[in-house]
Regions:
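Extracellular glycoside hydrolase catalytic/binding regions
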Residues: 1-117
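Aromatic-rich peripheral "rim/lid" segments of glycoside hydrolase catalytic domains that contact
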Residues: 18-25, 59, 91-106, 110-186
Length: 186
């Protein structure tokens, strides 16, 4: 079982983090962190201003900290099972990943600093060699026969994709894995 967590609209999605994870048969608490989908950051509108990215970060931290408190009260670890930020300027294809890399770096560092409380995290989403069918288009919705890019069919393909050649993002992940592996060493 996975849970997005309360999201900014818990009554809309009918999520209650404590109730959803309170069962003795659930071993850990899960949340998602989606600043763009939740209206905390619009890389296209802001052109990725540092101020707007910082707002997204602060909103994410407040959201995570609230989930950490619930997880601690349930004596269960927290897993951020999905966290994401689009490519710079909201591009689905091409474009740099400097904003996303900065956000991911902060996310990994912040969560790794909470051993015993935060057990892990997963980014969204691996596309590898997959690409939207029209690389020149701003937004391409999946259709049968299209490559899988990690994004669900109803969302723009490549929106949140990490491609095989996104070397700087891969470096962020390598550092993140290293930070979390320290948890195992006590």
């Amino acid at each position: 079982m996975g849970s997005e967590g309360p999201t900014p609209w818990p009554s809309y999605v009918n999520n209650d983090l404590r109730q959803d994870h309170g069962s003795e048969h659930i071993d850990y608490v899960t949340i998602h962190v989606w600043p763009q989908n939740w209206g905390w950051f619009d890389p296209a509108a802001s052109k990725g201003s540092a101020k707007d990215l910082e707002h997204a970060w602060k909103a994410s931290v407040a959201y995570i900290d609230a989930a950490v408190a619930v997880a601690a009260s349930l004596t269960k670890p927290l897993v951020v099972e999905e966290f994401v930020l689009a490519r710079d300027n909201g591009r689905s294809t091409g474009g740099s990943t400097s904003q996303r890399d900065a956000f991911y770096t902060k996310m990994c560092s912040y969560l790794a600093a909470k051993p015993g409380t935060v057990a892990g995290l997963n980014f969204w989403a691996w596309a590898g060699e997959g690409r939207p069918r029209d690389m020149a288009a701003e937004r391409v919705i999946w259709a049968p026969g299209d490559a899988w890019t990690g994004d669900p069919p109803h969302e723009p393909q490549g929106w949140y994709s990490v491609y095989a050649e996104d070397a700087t993002t891969h470096s962020v992940f390598a550092q993140c894995v290293s930070s979390f592996s320290l948890h195992d060493e006590g």
